[in-house]
Swiss-Prot record:
This is Protein translocase subunit SecA. Zn(2+) binds at residues 902, 904, 913-914. It is found in: Cell inner membrane; Cytoplasm. May bind 1 zinc ion per subunit. Residues 908-918 have a biased composition (Basic residues).
Length: 918
C-alpha cells in the first residue's frame, strides 16, 4: 500500500526516464518552425551539415535535436505524417540502445526513422530487423521515402537475392531485412574463401521490430546451414508402421506440460517383439547399448504420433511437412525439427522423407544479436519480459506513454465447463456485435481451432474471414480490413502481424487492392476520393458501435501473446473492447489442474451454458502464466549457457578464418603447423626421459610415412649412439622444410602460397563441421552426468574444450599431410577458386540439399578420402595415388589420412576402423 502511494507521489523509474526525455522534445519542437520555411533542397542539405558536425568531433547526442527535427520535417513532406512528441521520445529510447514498448497503432515504424537516420549519419550502416519479407519490403519502400529524400541510401534483404544484390544492400546507409536473412548471411560469410566475396559489413547498430518475438520466442531456435548425411528413409517408414500398428493407449505415458512421451514397460515389450519380427532388432533387449540409434528413432516416431498434431503443430503442403510457429501461427518455411523428428513426421504423413543432415554452421539469435555493438528494439509488449531482456541482452525496457489515452475496455474472462459451451457463447457474442455493425477479431491458438470456429459460423451463415498459416499470402489485406463495419475476422495468434487494424478500413490497402490496374489521372483521383469518403463514413459507424471487439478463445501460456491480441483494439485513442472465453478443456486450464476446478463448479451448481466470471479467476490464470513464463525463461537461460561454450569457440574459428583470408600468404602459419606436428609425432613415439629401448620406432616410422610421405630411415637414426629425440625432430623438420622448398621451386612461390591458403581454409571448414557434430553428440547425453553427482554444464565446458583442442591438432596434422603429398599437374596453370559450400538454410535442423563437396573444378587438388583433396604420387613413388586404392585390399589403404572415411565403406573414420590396427 505504502509502495503504491510512494509511486503515485514520486513516480517509478520508468516515469523518471520518460520525464527526462521531455527536455529534448522541447528542444526539437523549438527547431521545427525554422525548418518549415526551408525549401526541399535546403532541408536536404542538412544531412551534409550534420555529417560535417560529426566529422569535427561532435557526438550523435550533440546533433540529436537537429537530426530528429530534420526527419520530422522530411516525414511531413514525403509521407504527410508528423512525429508526435511521444514518438520523438521513442526515437531517443532506441538511440540509447533500449527497448521501447509502444502500444499497437502508436506508429513504431515511423518512430524507428528517427534513430535510424541519426545513427546512419556515421556511415557505418544501420540494420532494421523485421519478422518477415513482406514487412521488410513494405517498410524499406515506405520509410525509405524519408531517407532517400534526405540523401541516404536504403537496401532491403529478402529471400532469393544473389550475393551481388546482398552486398549492395548491406553497403547502403540503412538496410532492412528479416532476422533469418541477417543471421544466415553472417553464417554464409564465414564460409566464404575471399574477403571480397563476403556481403556484410562490420556490425554497428540494429533496431529489432517485434523484439520480443525475435529475441525471446525464437531465441531457442538456432539458424543452421547444413549438408546431407546418410539416407535412413526406409528405417523411418518401418518404425512409423511399428508405432502406428503396435502402440495403443496404455502402452505409453505422456506429460503435456513437459512435452514428453515414453513407452511403458508393456509398450516396450510389444515394440521390441515387433522389431524382432521385422528383423530390425537382433536381440530381445531393445535397450542394449548397440541399439541406441534404434531406440532414438523409435522414440521420435512415438513423439510424432502422440505429441504432434496435424494443423496444430504443423501442416502438410506441397508434399512437405511445414512447421507452424506456436507464437504467431505462421508457416515456418524451411525450418525443420532436429534429430530425426521431422523425418518421423514425414513418415507419419506419407510425404517424401528428406535426408537427415549434418550441421555446417549454426548460431542462435541470442548470440547473433549480441554481436552488434549497439542494439535496440520496439514492441507493443515487452514489460512482462523486462527481466529477461536485461539479464541476457543488457537491454532495459522503457514503457512509452500513448499519444492519446487508451479507451479499450478489458472485460473479465468467462469460464465454461466445456469447449462446446464456450464456442456457443462466442458465436452469440459475434452475432450481437454484427447486429450493431461492430467489427470482431477472434484470436485462436491453432489452425485447427480457427477452422472449427469457422465451421460453426458457416452453419450460422455468418460471413467471416479466416487468417492462419494456410492463407499467409492474403494476411496483410485481411488484417487491414478487419475494422470495417460488421467484419468478423478469425486469426491464429496475432503476434508480429505488423499491419494495423484501422476502424472503417485501411485506405492504402484498399487503393492497392482495388485500383492497382487504374493508371494515374483524374479517374484514379476520383476513385481514391470515393474510397476515402467510404472509409470515413464506415469509421463513424464503427465508432458508434463501440470500436473493434477482440475475442480470445483461449489463454496462451504467455501473457505477452494475450496482451498482443488485446492490443489490436483501442489504437490511437479509439474505443474498443476485449474478452477471453475459456473452458476447462483448454490446454492451459487442463495442464494446470482444471479437474479440481471442474469438481468445484459442479458443486456450485453451474448449469450447462452458464459461465463463471470473477477477477479471482483472472488472477489465478495470470499466476499460472507467470509460472510458465518463468519456466521457459529458465530453459532459455540454461540453453544460452551451453550455447555460449560453442559461441566462444565459434568466435575464435571465425576470427582466425578471417585473418587467413585477410593475409597475403599463410606460409608462416603452415610452417609453424608442420613443425608442431613433427614435434607431436616424435613426442608420442619417444616419451620424455624414456630409454632408447622404450622408443616406439615402428610407430614413428609409420607416422612419418603417413604424414610426410617418405620412407625415412627413422629406425636407423634411433640406433645411433647418443642420439636424442631433439635430433630426430630436427632431421624430420629439415627434411620436411627442404621438401616444401623443392615444391616451391618447381611450382613457383605464387602458386604455392595460393595452395596453402586454399587448403588451410578448406580443411578448417571440414574440421569445424566435424567439431560441431561432436559437440551435438556431447550435448545430447551430457545431462546424464547429473546422476553421477557432476554438474552437466561444467562437464560440457571441460569436454568441449578438449574436443576443440583435438580439432586444432587434427587441423595441423591434415594441413601438413596434404601439403607434403600435394602434386600440381602441369595443366593447372591457375589454381581455381575454392568452391563455396552449398547448404540448406534451416531453422532448428538441416534440410536436404546437395553438399557441394564434389563440385570442385577438374584439376583442383584433391584428397584420398573423396572430400576436397587427393594426393598425387609423391617424389620417386613412395605414395600410391588415390586411384590405386582397392576396396577389397586393405594393404593398399595404409596411407589413407586418419580422419578420412575408411575405404572399407563402413562410414567410420579410418582411425576408428581399419586404421586402429596399425
Amino acid at each position: 500500500m505504502f509502495g503504491a502511494i510512494a509511486r503515485k507521489l514520486f513516480g517509478n523509474a520508468n516515469d523518471r526516464v520518460v520525464k527526462g526525455l521531455r527536455k529534448q522534445v522541447e528542444a526539437i519542437n523549438a527547431i521545427e518552425p525554422k525548418l518549415t520555411g526551408l525549401s526541399d533542397a535546403e532541408l536536404q542539405m542538412r544531412t551534409d551539415w550534420l555529417r560535417d558536425r560529426l566529422a569535427k568531433g561532435e557526438t550523435l547526442d550533440d546533433i540529436l535535436p537537429d537530426a530528429f527535427a530534420t526527419v520530422r520535417e522530411a516525414a511531413k513532406r514525403t509521407l504527410g505524417q508528423r512525429h508526435f512528441d511521444v514518438q520523438l521520445m521513442g526515437g531517443m529510447v532506441l538511440h540509447t540502445g533500449k527497448i521501447a514498448e509502444m502500444r499497437t497503432g502508436e506508429g513504431k515504424t515511423l518512430v524507428a526513422t528517427l534513430a535510424v537516420y541519426l545513427n546512419a549519419l556515421e556511415g557505418k550502416g544501420v540494420h532494421v530487423v523485421t519478422v518477415n519479407d513482406y514487412l521488410a519490403k513494405r517498410d524499406s519502400g515506405w520509410m525509405g521515402q524519408i531517407y532517400r529524400f534526405l540523401g541516404l541510401s536504403v537496401g532491403c534483404i529478402v529471400h532469393g537475392l544473389d550475393d551481388a544484390e546482398r552486398r549492395a544492400a548491406y553497403a547502403a546507409d540503412i538496410t532492412y531485412g528479416t532476422n533469418n536473412e541477417f543471421g544466415f548471411d553472417y553464417l554464409r560469410d564465414n564460409m566464404k574463401y575471399r574477403l571480397a566475396d563476403m556481403v556484410q559489413r562490420p556490425f554497428n547498430f540494429a533496431i529489432v521490430d517485434e523484439v520480443d518475438s525475435i529475441l525471446i520466442d525464437e531465441a531457442r531456435t538456432p539458424l543452421i546451414i547444413s549438408g546431407p548425411s546418410t539416407d535412413s528413409s526406409e528405417l523411418y517408414i518401418a518404425l512409423d508402421k511399428v508405432v502406428r500398428e503396435t502402440v495403443q493407449d496404455g502402452d505409453f505415458e505422456k506429460d503435456e506440460k513437459a512435452r514428453a512421451v515414453s513407452l511403458t514397460e508393456g509398450g516396450t515389450e510389444k515394440v521390441a517383439q515387433r522389431l524382432i519380427e521385422i528383423g530390425l532388432l537382433k536381440t530381445g533387449d531393445l535397450y542394449d547399448i548397440h541399439n541406441v540409434t534404434l531406440v532414438h528413432h523409435v522414440n521420435q516416431a512415438l513423439r510424432a504420433h502422440k505429441l504432434f498434431t496435424r494443423d496444430v503443430d504443423y501442416i502438410v503442403k506441397d508434399d512437405k511437412v511445414v512447421i507452424i510457429d506456436e507464437f504467431t501461427g505462421r508457416m515456418m518455411e524451411g525450418r525443420r525439427y532436429s534429430e530425426g523428428l521431422h523425418q518421423a513426421l514425414e513418415a507419419k504423413e506419407g510425404v517424401t522423407i528428406q535426408r537427415e543432415n549434418q550441421t555446417l554452421a549454426s548460431i542462435t539469435f541470442q548470440n547473433y544479436f549480441r554481436l552488434y555493438p549497439k542494439l535496440a528494439g520496439m514492441t507493443g509488449t515487452a514489460m512482462t519480459e523486462a527481466a529477461e531482456f536485461m539479464e541476457i541482452y543488457g537491454l532495459p525496457v522503457v514503457d512509452m506513454p500513448t499519444n492519446l489515452p487508451v479507451r479499450r475496455k478489458d472485460q473479465d474472462d468467462e469460464v465454461y465447463r466445456t469447449a462446446d459451451e464456450k464456442y456457443a457463447a462466442i458465436i452469440t457474442l459475434i452475432e450481437e456485435c454484427r447486429a450493431r455493425q461492430q467489427p470482431v477479431l477472434v484470436g485462436t491458438v491453432s489452425i485447427e481451432k480457427s477452422e472449427l470456429l469457422s465451421d460453426f459460423l458457416k452453419k450460422k451463415k455468418v460471413p467471416h474471414n479466416v487468417l492462419n498459416a494456410r492463407y499467409h499470402e492474403q494476411e496483410a489485406y485481411i488484417v487491414a480490413q478487419a475494422g470495417r463495419p460488421g467484419a468478423v475476422t478469425i486469426a491464429t495468434n496475432m503476434a508480429g502481424r505488423g499491419t494495423d487494424i484501422q476502424l472503417g478500413g485501411n485506405l492504402e490497402m484498399r487503393i492497392e487492392h482495388e485500383l492497382s490496374d487504374l493508371p494515374e489521372g483524374p479517374e484514379r483521383e476520383a476513385a481514391i476520393a470515393r474510397i476515402r469518403d467510404e472509409i470515413a463514413a464506415a469509421k463513424e459507424v464503427v465508432l458508434k458501435a463501440g470500436g473493434l471487439y477482440v475475442v480470445g478463445t483461449e489463454r496462451h501460456e504467455s501473457r505477452r501473446i494475450d496482451n498482443q491480441l488485446r492490443g489490436r483494439s483501442g489504437r490511437q485513442g479509439d474505443p474498443g473492447a476485449s474478452k477471453f472465453f475459456l473452458s476447462l478443456e483448454d490446454d492451459l486450464m487442463r495442464i494446470f489442474g482444471s479437474q479440481r476446478l471442474d469438481g468445484m463448479l459442479q458443486k456450485l451448481g453451474l448449469q450447462e451454458g452458464e459461465a463463471i466470471i470473477h477477477p479471482w479467476i483472472n488472477k489465478a490464470l495470470e499466476k499460472a502464466q507467470t509460472k510458465v513464463e518463468a519456466h521457459n525463461f529458465d530453459i532459455r537461460k540454461n540453453l544460452l549457457k551451453y550455447d555460449n561454450v560453442m559461441n566462444d569457440q565459434r568466435k575464435v574459428v571465425y576470427e582466425q578464418r578471417r585473418d587467413v583470408m585477410d593475409a597475403e600468404d599463410v606460409q608462416d602459419t603452415v610452417v609453424s603447423m608442420r613443425h608442431e606436428v613433427i614435434q607431436e609425432m616424435v613426442s608420442k613415439a619417444i616419451p620424455p626421459n624414456a630409454y632408447a629401448e622404450q622408443w616406439n620406432t615402428d610407430q614413428l616410422h609409420e607416422e612419418v610415412m603417413r604424414v610426410l610421405g617418405a620412407d625415412l630411415p627413422v629406425k636407423e637414426w634411433a640406433k645411433e649412439e647418443g642420439i636424442a629425440d631433439a635430433e630426430i625432430v630436427e632431421r624430420l623438420t629439415r627434411f620436411a622444410d627442404e621438401t616444401m622448398a623443392e615444391k616451391e621451386a618447381a611450382y613457383g612461390a605464387t602458386l604455392m602460397r595460393s595452395i596453402e591458403k586454399s587448403l588451410l581454409l578448406q580443411i578448417l571448414d571440414q574440421q569445424w563441421k566435424d567439431h560441431l557434430l561432436n559437440l551435438d553428440h556431447l550435448r545430447q547425453g551430457i545431462n546424464l552426468r547429473a546422476y553421477a553427482q557432476r554438474d552437466p554444464l561444467n562437464e560440457y565446458k571441460r569436454e568441449a574444450f578438449g574436443l576443440f583442442e583435438t580439432m586444432l591438432a587434427s587441423l595441423r596434422e591434415q594441413v601438413t599431410t596434404v601439403l607434403m603429398h600435394v602434386q600440381v599437374r602441369q595443366a593447372d596453370a591457375d589454381l581455381p577458386t575454392p568452391p563455396e559450400p552449398v547448404g540448406e538454410l534451416t531453422r532448428e535442423d538441416p534440410a536436404l540439399v546437395p553438399a557441394g563437396a564434389e563440385a570442385l573444378p577438374p584439376g583442383m587438388v584433391r584428397r584420398a578420402d573423396d572430400q576436397r583433396l587427393r594426393p598425387q604420387a609423391y617424389g620417386a613413388g613412395a605414395l600410391p595415388v588415390a586411384e590405386t586404392l582397392e576396396r577389397d585390399t586393405p594393404e593398399s589403404w595404409r596411407n589413407t589420412p586418419r580422419n578420412a572415411p575408411c575405404p572399407c565403406g563402413s562410414g567410420k573414420k579410418y582411425k576408428h576402423c581399419h586404421g586402429q590396427a596399425r
